[in-house]
Each structure stands twice: as structure tokens, then as C-alpha cells.
Amino acid sequence: MIQIDTIPKELQSIQPFVRRFNELEAHNPVIAYWSLYWAAQMALSSSHGVSNECKDFLLSLIEHLEDLRKNLGENENVSDETSAKAYVESFSLEVLVQAERNSKNGKPDVQAYLAARDFLELSRIWGPPTEQITKSIKFCKLRALQVANPQRKAKTPSNHATEELQQSSTNSTTLPTQEAAVETNASASHETSFALPTTSPAASLSISPTKSAAVSSEPNVEADVKSLSSTPAAPQLNSPSHSYEPTTFPSTTSITENLPTIDPTRSTRSSSHIQSLSPESKQTSDGHRPPSPTSITTTSTSIDPSVAFSSKSTLATTRTNAPLSRPSQPTKASPLNKFSALEAIQSARSHARYAYSALDYEDTTTAIHHLKSALKLLEEEEQGNHTAD
């Protein structure tokens, strides 16, 4: 591990990459190696005219890099240029994809976007980055600024993440198109503190917090950050991705009690009987239908469905708080001897179903009444059979 505070002031621009090296040295030595390699290359490019302190630090950095290279041996993601570039870009894009997932899940992390930015910068080792990598780098900076903006209002200026963002720069706010991350080379997969996306939806990105701010080597930092912060087209992380409207419920005064009916929250066992309770399916032998339950609005009692089947029943006067929508005339049921045995059994079944439905509402009085009516029909039908015999 390289102590950040030992980096000379003239080489502060390499801090982010030294920090990534410290974070991944024990978990992903390949990415750690390339992070330190890029830090050394940046330091060498700016070593002209530096102090002896900087030269000593640079020599120790190169020695550390050589030791790490020996430990990696013949790893193709280090020895082979094409494989190394593909592996670094794949890892970088995976970190960015995971940062976006966390943001969409309501857990945006500034450090996740900053880490993705640093890893994407490593592609410069093999020449100018592609257009997609360039857009992804700018996208990381923009997203990090969007996450940090509300935090900067509540935190002191000494906040390290805010300081690092203020030193980041960009010349464009063009967002990259969504592309799937390149699959990581299986031969060089390592356990890493940056949890890579997997098939499991519970995969998460864990980035160790840093203790100091990174200094960008790009010019006009403050102006670029200001332009990023005021970009009108920038998406807001904190805004909800979906809009839900409250469910509209009907007024309780407009609900009519239709007995018997099945509460939609009841079990499927009880709901299976509702289809057989339709009044249109029940008809007496003289052509009269039982009064429809939906034609009556009541708050205290209900019309007895047995009037269509009983030989002695008449329509009882009910106490209601609302007028009858269609007054029913008292019906005279046909004598039982005009019923066929099949019709009597069917009528008894209807009473039993009404009783069953009434029990769903714990209306034992109605249930008992219909059960008695069903038993009476069956007893009279049985008595008629004995008489005929």
C-alpha cells in the first residue's frame, strides 16, 4: 500500500489512481497493477524539472510496480495488450453499470461514479480512448455531480467527495448510449471489493470511502463544473421514475347491499358458488322469476329469495332507507304438486346456495331460513313420492 500523504504536491494528479491501487491490491491485482502503471506514466510525463523529492517518490513507485508485475507472472491480462485492454474496459463498464443500478434503486453513490471514471481513464494506457469510453467518462463526472449537488448544500466545504468533484472537469454533457458491459475474461477473474454485476438481482457495489480529494490534471476545472451543474438536460436521480395515482374508491353511500353476494376478498372456495346464484338462471314453473337482488337498495334487511319457490310465501314488506328501484308484485307460487321432482330438487339446491352465501357474511338468520325452506321442499317432495307409491 502506498500512503496518499507521501505523494508530493507536484504529483497530486496521480492521487485517484494510487487510491484505486490501494483499494484493489489485495482483491484484484490486475486492475491494481494497471492503476499504478497509469499513475507512474502520468508522473513520468510531468517529471521534467521536478524536485528531488518527486524523483525519489517516482523511483519507489516504479520499484513497487515491478514487484507487482513479477507477482502476476504470465497473466494474459497483463502480458497481452489486447486482452489487457479488453479486461480493463470490461471491468470499468461493469462498475459504471452497477453504479447506475444502485442509483435506480434509490442508493446513488458519488464514490461509485468516481471509481468508474478512474477505471475508464485507464484505457488511455493503450492510446486515445474510443468515443464510447470518452462519453462514459463524461457521463460518470456528470452523474457524480448530480448526486453530490444536494449533498453539498448540507455538508461543510471540507467534504472530500465534494472537493474531488469540484476538481473534475468536462467539456461536454453528452450522455453515453446504454450498452451492455463487456463480459469479463474468465481466466483472469478475481475477487474484488467492487462487486461485479452477476445474474443475481441482489448483487451490489461496495466501494471503500476515501480520505482525500483527487486533483484533476485538466484545466478550467471550476468553469466546467459550473457548466455541468447548470446543464438543463441532466436527469435527476432523486426524481421518481414512476408516477402512481391513488386508487379511487366509490363512496360508501352509493354502495348497495346485494344479498347474497361474495366478497371479492373471500376464499376461492366460497367464490366458486357465486355463478350459480344469478337470478336469471332460476325460474318457477308459472314463468315468474325471483326478484333480482340488484333491484333493491337496502341498509337493514333484504328480500327473501324463497318467495319464488315456496307455495305459501308472499313478498314480505321490508324496512329500507332508500326507495325500491322496481317494486315487485306479490307472486303466488304454484302448488308443489305442479313441480316435477327435478324442479323441487333444483329449488332446494338454490336455497342451500343462498344459505351458504349468507354464512359468508355470518348472517345465520338468513342461512337458517333458506335451509329450512330447502328441507321443507325436500320433505314435501319425498312425501309426494310416498303418496304416489
Curated annotation (Swiss-Prot):
Q: Where is the composition biased (Polar residues)?
A: 156-177, 184-219, 227-282, 308-334
Biological processes per GO annotation: late endosome to vacuole transport via multivesicular body sorting pathway; lipid transport; protein transport
The segment annotated Disordered runs over 149-335
Q: Which InterPro entries match?
A: Vta1-like, Vta1/CALS_N, Vta1/CALS_N_sf, Vta1_C
Task: Please note every region of biased composition (Low complexity).
Answer: 294-306
Annotated keywords: Cytoplasm, Endosome, Lipid transport, Membrane, Protein transport, Transport
One Pfam family name from the record? Vta1_C
GO cellular component, alphabetical, reads:
endosome membrane; multivesicular body
Q: How does it sit in the membrane?
A: Peripheral membrane protein
Where in or outside the cell it occurs: the entry states: Cytoplasm; Endosome membrane
What the protein does? Has a role in the formation of the multivesicular body (MVB). Required for the sorting of lipids to form intralumenal vesicles and for fluid-phase transport to the vacuole. Required for sorting several plasma membrane proteins into the MVB.
Q: How does it assemble?
A: Homodimer (in cytoplasm).
Family stated for the protein in its record = Belongs to the VTA1 family.
Q: What is this protein called?
A: Vacuolar protein sorting-associated protein vts1
